[in-house]
Amino acid sequence: MKQQLLERFLSYVSFNTQSDGRSQNVPSTHSQFVFAQHLRQELVSLGFEDVQLSDKGYLTATVPANVEGVACIGFIAHLDTAPDYSGENVSPQIIENYNGEDIQLGLEEVLSPKQFSSLNQYIGQTLITTDGSSLLGGDDKAGIAEIISALHHLLTHPEIPHGKIRLCFTPDEEIGRGADHFDVESFGAQWAYTIDGGQVGELEYENFNAATAVVTAMGNNCHPGTAYGVMVNAQTIAARFHAKMPLKDTPEHSRDYDGFFHLLGMEGVTEKATLTYIIRDFDLELFEQRKRWLTELVEKYNAELSIGQLTIDIQDSYLNMKQQVLPHPHIIDIAKQAMQNLAIEPIIKPIRGGTDGSRLSYMGLPCPNLFTGGHNFHGKHEYVCVESMVKATETIVEIAKLTAQHK
């Protein structure tokens, strides 16, 4: 299984599937559809049933049940890689029997246990790293490789009891659109798991409540030589507004269950300037308080202005899946037991972000998140451990077996 996983993963990361938040297309990049077509052909050749690729880039397939009366479950991963860092010409490095020392990434970069202490747990194992010029794509091509490998194992080992199993590979998860065209009804699963986490043992069913706020400052432009008493610089208004934001309530000062405001982007000219913030909190009431506080700050600042004005638009992005998953405790219990059966210690922690599963849970498909075995996603220091990928694959198989016992 290890060699098969490795070969499958290396094949997948050769596809540059970065999504593009500026695009209105679905998928946002054609390369995701090309990758999905490749996977469709592979699934058909491996004997999966009902292999379908929608015009929106959603790839689904089925492993038929070999026992009756068992819940249909699903496994989900995403096709795209993050637009945050280059995904072109990915050149993986395979480090066998890792010795615990610095790993050279090309000529200029280093992956060091001094900076990334997680490396210390993988001494003696096989790592896949970047060459320093791109991200790796383990998020989420490791998840895709693990799902296909696990479900193919079930197809070729009919002695393992399991119910009907569905898979779906979604586009544009990294830009928050992965669930936009997901057809929960036709998917037909009672619950599902995204395979989109990090280190071995991660089991996540809490995520941020998330919103985006766009604060717009309006000014008045004129020739700077005749600007006295006339010009209103929207950029100055925006900068002074941001100076009123709490300095410590930001991502770089938060961890665990802390929420934050994050200035994601700012742009403007004299006439108009915009500040784009993301708002995050695990607690729903605190989340609502944050949105109210920011709105009130805009109102107070407007009252101080003699000229110029701010407006604010806040849109919710996704909510904490915890409220939708906890009423179905068997979903978590089965995943925990599957790991324990494989001598894996479950690591239950909140997702300081979101997954397709967070939105799908509110669409009627409870969907916690499981580990892939990767680290340092979205950048040049990304790496995955092949032995961890094997464990993720085995966990998927074990979940299928345990679900067959849960009637």
Curated annotation (Swiss-Prot):
The residues that hold Zn(2+) 1 are: 78, 139, 196
EC number(s) for this protein?
A: 3.4.11.4
Cofactor note (record): Binds 2 Zn(2+) ions per subunit.
Entry binding sites for Zn(2+) 2? 139, 174, 378
Keyword annotations: Aminopeptidase, Cytoplasm, Hydrolase, Metal-binding, Metalloprotease, Protease, Zinc
Q: Which Gene3D superfamilies match?
A: 3.30.70.360, Zn peptidases (3.40.630.10)
Extract one GO cellular component term from the record. Answer: cytosol
Location(s), subcellular: Cytoplasm
Enzyme active site:
80, 173 (proton acceptor)
Q: Does the keyword Cytoplasm apply?
A: yes
Q: Which GO terms describe its biological process?
A: peptide catabolic process; proteolysis
Role played: Cleaves the N-terminal amino acid of tripeptides.
Full protein name: Peptidase T
Naturally occurring in which organism (per UniProt): Shewanella halifaxensis (strain HAW-EB4)
Gene field: pepT
